[in-house]
Amino acid sequence: MASKSGDGGTVCALEFAVQMSCQSCVDAVHKTLKGVAGVQNVDVQLENQMVLVQTTLPSQEVQALLESTGRQAVLKGMGSSQLQNLGAAVAILEGCGSIQGVVRFLQLSSELCLIEGTIDGLEPGLHGLHVHQYGDLTRDCNSCGDHFNPDGASHGGPQDTDRHRGDLGNVRAEAGGRATFRIEDKQLKVWDVIGRSLVIDEGEDDLGRGGHPLSKITGNSGKRLACGIIARSAGLFQNPKQICSCDGLTIWEERGRPIAGQGRKDSAQPPAHL
């Protein structure tokens, strides 16, 4: 299963744009992140309104810490702790009812991929998470195809050698319906999944060990609740944008708007905090 935040793991670098105007802003950021378990190093650049955090925490948790200072923060890029850009991607998940989430993929090295994210609106408990073959949402999640499985293997758990490449195991939603997770995977590569889809399921994935007819096919994790196409995203220092060329919104205005649709133009739209 996915690790809980602060439980260790491989350090990555997160690049945030943070609204800062003076030295007291810088001091507030340092004070908030100092001593936080999982935060290894913090570089604050006032002139660039940038905060670079070396951490093992999910990006959403670091963003929440930064915004607890009363300043808006926007994740602009991710990279390895050596500040290398080996590939990054993102999936915006939408589905049944109020379920929505953001999941990011980062190639930490040629052997290791980080998958981290936050999904809201789930029933408390374990939910199977998988990369699927197709980035086709024409019939919602039903047109995403089977699990990504270029090797023709049986379904298994993320620690198994014999498994679908897209088998990411389970993530746990807490009592409030939010799942925040950080997975390190040795089989998945960012460059292999761009253009495919990510799907979260209704129930727990039995990791191929349940004895059900679907155990070795899907993990018997129930219907598909939410999904999104995996798209390339910016690595470290690859996103200098301050104003969106398509509609003139600043990154701070975008922070509280949907990525697309009518709600993007609605100034009263509350932030999703994803």
Curated annotation (Swiss-Prot):
Record's GO cellular component terms: mitochondrial intermembrane space; nucleus
Tissues of expression: Ubiquitous.
Pfam families per the UniProt record, alphabetical: HMA, Sod_Cu
InterPro entries per the UniProt record, alphabetical: HMA_dom (IPR006121), HMA_dom_sf (IPR036163), SOD-like_Cu/Zn_dom_sf (IPR036423), SOD_Cu/Zn_/chaperone (IPR024134), SOD_Cu/Zn_BS (IPR018152), SOD_Cu_Zn_dom (IPR001424)
Binding sites annotated in the UniProt record for Cu cation 2: C244, C246
Parts of the chain that traverse the membrane: none
Keyword DNA repair: no
Cofactor note: Binds 2 copper ions per subunit. Binds 1 zinc ion per subunit.
Cystine pairings recorded for this chain: C141-C227
Cofactor: Cu(2+); Zn(2+)
Phosphoserine PTM positions: S267
CDD domains with a match to the protein in the record: Cu-Zn_Superoxide_Dismutase (cd00305), HMA (cd00371)
Cross-referenced PROSITE patterns: HMA_2, SOD_CU_ZN_2
Covalent cross-link (Glycyl lysine isopeptide (Lys-Gly) (interchain with G-Cter in ubiquitin)), residues: K76, K189, K216, K241
Post-translational modification summary for this protein: Ubiquitinion by XIAP/BIRC4 leads to enhancement of its chaperone activity toward its physiologic target, SOD1, rather than proteasomal degradation. XIAP/BIRC4 preferentially ubiquitinates at Lys-241.
Function: Delivers copper to copper zinc superoxide dismutase (SOD1).
Family: In the C-terminal section; belongs to the Cu-Zn superoxide dismutase family.
Protein name as annotated: Copper chaperone for superoxide dismutase
Annotated source species: Mus musculus
Gene that encodes the chain: Ccs
